[in-house]
Amino acid sequence: IASENGLRTRAWVEDNRRTVDKLSGGRLAYVWLPNTAGPGYTSFVRYFYAQQNREGTVVDERYNQGGMVADFIVNELDRKPMGFFAQRDGSPFFSPIAGINGPKVMIINESAGSGGDALPFYFKLRKLGPLIGTRTWGGLVGTLGTPPTIDGGGITAPSLAFYNFDGKWDVENIGVSPDINVENTPIANGKD
């Protein structure tokens, strides 16, 4: 193993999942999103759908490194039941079957940006639940391509910026503020 970072991250995620499971009596799902690119979508699918039997969801996007716009994740979180199917020899089930229909909450912090800014912005826009934590860092711009330089390097500069339905630039240099501000100060609490 070249680095233990991945193992430590996985241990942190699993500790959080077990804590949410224990404190909620098995009623809440815990889903951590490391980014809004491939690994983030993999994490979402792995954790969200495996916990479909839960009554609510804690989405943790702290330290989200961004990637792409997270509309897929928000759309999945926002799925509403459209009816039931009755089984001849079993209990009825919701349609669509994949999803957690109960309350949702998202944990955010100042180390989430770009797609990690877009995700809580969309979550709040759709009124999926409260945002808890600290304001995201406010870096919602994007790049398209990396023009090469003569020495074989590359240059990146923002080529996309986000604005809202009022026609105003939004989120960039502002971030997304929580509904409930909670500072994570484990050292101050003697829990480092």
Regions found by a protein language model. Name each.
Residues I1-G153, I187-D192:
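Cleft-lining beta-strand/loop regions that shape enzyme active-site pockets
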